[in-house]
């Protein structure tokens, strides 16, 4: 059970990092404020670095990476484009990214509780990813 929970938790973290990177990429070029753009780029870099670590661990377990579901990606894309179409401001970007972070934090905590038998390393990665999301939410709050 430890192996199964470990792999499943890592796969959920993998999907989460990919979703974060994709979402940040969708809005980054639309951000006007230089500091906000730097915050988003820094967070994207953290997500990519952690994603690479997750990929290595999944490979060492002989399992495949996990992409976000098509439904999640499609809904995110629609919401982003609809909101940005109505108001392409930095406040809208901050709102969208904050919503995404909150969904990520909620999901990751759910998976930490669900995959209790996961190994220490995968739990640490989940916790690190939650911290990255929480920091980004806090940093973006001044743009809301």
Identify the function of each model-found stretch.
Residues 1-144:
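Amphipathic alpha-helical hairpins
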């Amino acid at each position: 059970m430890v192996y199964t929970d470990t792999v499943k938790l890592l796969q959920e973290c993998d999907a989460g990092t990919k979703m974060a990177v994709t979402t940040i990429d969708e809005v980054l070029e639309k951000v006007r404020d230089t500091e906000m753009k730097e915050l988003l780029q820094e967070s994207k870099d953290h997500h990519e670095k952690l994603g690479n670590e997750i990929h290595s661990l999944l490979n060492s377990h002989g399992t495949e990476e996990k992409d976000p579901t098509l439904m999640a990606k499609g809904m995110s894309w629609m919401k982003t484009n609809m909101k940005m179409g109505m108001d392409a401001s930095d406040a809208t970007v901050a709102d969208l990214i904050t919503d995404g972070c909150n969904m990520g934090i909620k999901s990751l905590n759910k998976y930490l509780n669900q995959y209790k038998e996961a190994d220490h390393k995968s739990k640490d990665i989940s916790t690190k990813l939650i911290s990255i999301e929480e920091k980004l939410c806090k940093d973006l709050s001044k743009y809301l």
